[in-house]
């Protein structure tokens, strides 16, 4: 199983790039440009549609992250600190991704469809979504860092 480690870590890294990089691009560029150039009542549903369509990418990446986390655990165990960091960060990332696509994003879309974007509950969900992304990015950095750190110990 240890011989598969480069493939496992490459799959994980590719999933992290697609997921975290994609979410960063959508939030930093798409949302900023849409809300700058379009009326709010047009930009908000457009961004909601974009994020909903990107949820398919997130689901695929969550599956890869979960599998890679489990396979890496079987391959190397938990003997070294980087291995424990990678396990905890991969597990946290999987949970955060499931929370996003299973609850946060659908709740935001539902409130948007009902015209509740000015409600405090919508703002709370939007804040939760932003904080979840920040935690996802931190988890991704921890995973990549743990992979690099584990190379030093072998």
Language model: regions and residue ranges:
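Hydrophobic alpha-helical transmembrane segments
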Residues: 55-62, 126-141
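Mid-bilayer segments of alpha-helical transmembrane spans in multi-pass integral membrane proteins
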Residues: 91-106
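Interfacial loop at the N-terminal end of multi-pass membrane proteins
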Residues: 2-76, 111-123
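Short, charged juxtamembrane terminal tails flanking transmembrane helices
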Residues: 2-3, 149-154
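Alpha-helical transmembrane segments and their helix-start/interface "positive-inside/aromatic belt" motifs
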Residues: 3-16, 81-90, 146
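Phosphate-binding/catalytic loops
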Residues: 106-116, 132-135
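Cytoplasmic juxtamembrane regions at transmembrane-helix boundaries
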Residues: 73-91, 152-154
């Amino acid at each position: 199983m240890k011989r598969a480690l480069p493939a496992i870590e490459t799959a994980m890294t590719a999933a992290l790039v697609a997921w975290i990089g994609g979410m960063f691009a959508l939030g930093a560029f798409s949302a900023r440009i849409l809300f700058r150039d379009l009326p709010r009542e047009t930009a908000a549903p457009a961004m909601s549609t974009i994020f909903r369509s990107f949820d398919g990418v997130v689901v695929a990446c969550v599956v890869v992250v979960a599998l890679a986390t489990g396979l890496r655990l079987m391959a190397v165990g938990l003997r070294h600190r980087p291995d424990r960091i990678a396990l905890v960060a991969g597990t946290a990332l999987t949970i955060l991704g499931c929370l996003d696509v299973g609850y946060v994003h659908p709740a935001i879309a539902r409130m948007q469809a009902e015209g509740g974007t000015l409600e405090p509950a919508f703002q709370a969900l939007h804040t939760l979504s932003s904080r979840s992304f920040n935690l996802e990015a931190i988890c991704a950095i921890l995973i990549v860092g743990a992979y690099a750190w584990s190379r030093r110990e072998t």
